[in-house]
Amino acid sequence: MKRIINTVLVLLLTSMCFAQENPVKIVFDVTSQNTKVHESTIRHVKAMSNAYPDSKFEVVMYSGAMDMVLKDKSAVAEDVEMLAKKDNIDFVICQGTMKRHEVDSTQLIKGVRSVPDGILEIIEKQKEGWGYIKESQ
């Protein structure tokens, strides 16, 4: 966790120097069911989107992170809905994960979209030059 926080801090400090000149594209990989991980993901997305206002961010959730985007279970529902309204932030959930958890799109927080495969979504973003951050404990 300390390593993640230190990495984010370095990125934020660097971003202050280059925010206006060099927009970034970052994909966040979230698989944990731990609500502390969900909360730290939201903090990181908020901080980085403020530091890089002209940049793009996508949070990809799969496996154990299903509850992060469920209306009735998420500890960060209000934040997810608020951030998803921004043009430069996307929250996506894996359809395979939804199927395994027997969840349909009506149960998702407003603004969350689904993709066929979370891992492939991350791979595609990386192929397009997006930076990668793994959110974990």
Residue ranges and their predicted role:
Residues M1-K2, C17:
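Helix-enriched interaction subdomains in cytosolic or periplasmic regions
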Residues K2-V10:
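Sec-dependent signal peptide recognition
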Residues V10-F18:
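Hydrophobic h-region of N-terminal signal peptides that target proteins for export
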Residues Q20-Q137:
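Secreted/extracellular ectodomain signature
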